Swiss-Prot record:
Reactions accelerated catalytically: cyanurate + H2O = 1-carboxybiuret + H(+)
Example GO molecular function: metal ion binding
Domain characteristics, as noted in the entry: The monomer structure is formed from three repeating units (RUs) that share the same structure as one another. The monomer, the active site and substrate all possess threefold rotational symmetry, to the extent that the active site possesses three potential Ser-Lys catalytic dyads. It is possible that any or all of the three active-site serines may act as nucleophile (albeit only one can do so per catalytic cycle).
Stated name of the protein: Cyanuric acid amidohydrolase
Source organism per UniProt: Ectopseudomonas oleovorans (strain CECT 5344) (Pseudomonas pseudoalcaligenes)
Region of interest called RU C, as start-end residue ranges on this chain: 253-363
Active site, renumbered: 161, 230 (nucleophile)
Record text on subunit structure and interactions: Homotetramer.
GO BP terms: atrazine catabolic process
Region (RU A): 1-103
Protein purpose: Responsible for the hydrolysis of cyanuric acid, an intermediate formed during catabolism of s-triazine based compounds in herbicides such as atrazine and polymers such as melamine. Catalyzes the hydrolytic opening of the s-triazine ring of cyanuric acid (2,4,6-trihydroxy-s-triazine) to yield carbon dioxide and carboxybiuret, which spontaneously decarboxylates to biuret.
Enzyme Commission number, as recorded: 3.5.2.15
Chain residue ranges for the region called RU B: 111-247
């Protein structure tokens, strides 16, 4: 078996020209695509419709290529669009394919394994609560099974797309006599991301016990070092992509992870590379970098290594947007590449002010 990752630069949220060219050249086989991750150039907030624009464009594109309707495409491909390319970050897509028929060229080295799973649609009153934690946990376990990953320690990154609350959704719940986790629609993004991340932590055995509603977005000592969740208005379910290394998968692509302890922790790249099977023999160059995924969030302390920051005090630009620009610049400077999947909002995803980082390399 083999997972292939193709990184494509895009000119706009509806730009499928690079993807079409990759398919025409044989670089990408649309029948094997299981997920498309994308950084779009919106604000990453509630009213960022670049995510929905890109998702609807991609669904229509694959429906035409696969001779399916969009509902059928929705059942086989996870579309995870993360808004916000602040600073020098470059909008791009990461296309994940799985070829079940490809034999591994090296049976001694585990290779990149990928699997997807979806929850059912969440009701508004379930977003940001234990129901979302439990549904996510179950979906992560199903995605692991789809990837053939048997040990939780072989999972290096779990990327999730999750829903958020809108005024209409809050009112719909109230009409049925149901309460919601919060009434601020932007704040609901954090609750959804946090509950999703805790679902990953529960699936991977990183929690001391069951999660309670009152712990979500409050008890920050609970977190996953391998979860990345991105909230959006364009869906009602959680879409889960599990990435790890497993025997029997071709090792041309491999993954490793580490945790950025703060926004300046560029050394996390080296630690992530060290966790890649055979990573000590890999010299990381732009050609070998298949993808980088990382979470970013302003530290709640208001400082970075003892120096004050004002990311959380800016009334014009949300703090997560500042954090994406900062972390993106730190990592791009190390890698010489701005096509990095830097996602803001790291509730229960790594330590305060830091976040999980995953590195996909090509041998």
């Amino acid at each position: 078996m083999k997972t292939r990752v193709t990184r494509l630069t895009v000119a706009a949220p509806n730009d499928v020209s690079a993807l079409a060219q990759a398919i025409e050249s044989g670089e990408v086989d649309p029948t094997r695509v299981i997920a498309v991750l994308g950084k779009t150039e919106g604000n990453g907030c509630v009213n960022d419709f670049t995510r929905a624009f890109a998702t609807s464009t991609l669904k229509r594109f694959f429906a035409e290529r696969l001779a399916l309707n969009e509902t059928e495409v929705d059942e086989r491909i996870a579309f995870v669009m993360s808004g916000g390319t602040e600073g020098g970050l470059s909008p791009h897509w990461l296309v994940f394919e799985v070829d079940d028929s490809a034999p591994s060229r090296d049976t001694t080295t585990p290779g990149l394994a990928a699997g997807v799973a979806f929850t059912r649609d969440l009701r508004p009153e379930e977003i940001g609560r234990t129901s979302q934690v439990e549904l996510t946990r179950d979906a992560v376990l199903r995605a692991m099974a789809a990837a053939g990953i048997q040990r939780v320690e072989d999972v290096h990154f779990v990327q999730i797309k999750c829903p958020l609350l809108t005024a209409a959704r809050i009112n719909e719940a109230a009409a049925r006599g149901q309460s919601v986790a919060c009434h601020d629609t932007y704040e609901s993004m954090g609750y959804s991301r946090g509950a999703s991340a805790l679902g990953v932590a529960a699936a991977l055995g990183d929690l001391p016990g069951d999660v309670r509603d009152e712990q979500i977005c409050r008890e920050w000592s609970l977190y996953s070092s391998r979860a990345s969740s991105s909230a959006g208005i364009e869906l009602l379910r959680n879409e889960v992509l599990v990435l790890g290394n497993a025997p029997g998968w071709d090792p041309e692509y491999r993954i490793g992870h580490a945790v950025m302890e703060d926004a300046l922790d560029a050394q996390a790249i080296e630690r992530a590379l060290a966790s890649v099977p055979g990573g000590d023999k890999i010299k990381l160059t732009p050609e070998r970098l298949a993808g980088l995924l990382v979470k970013a969030e302003p530290s709640a302390s208001g400082s970075i290594r003892g120096n004050r920051h004002v990311m959380s005090d800016d009334s014009d630009i949300n703090g997560s947007r500042h954090a994406r620009a900062l972390v993106g610049g730190v990592l791009a400077g190390q890698l010489g590449d701005t096509r990095l999947f830097v996602s803001g909002g790291a509730e229960h995803q790594g330590p305060n002010g830091g976040g999980p980082l995953a590195l996909i390399v090509r041998s």
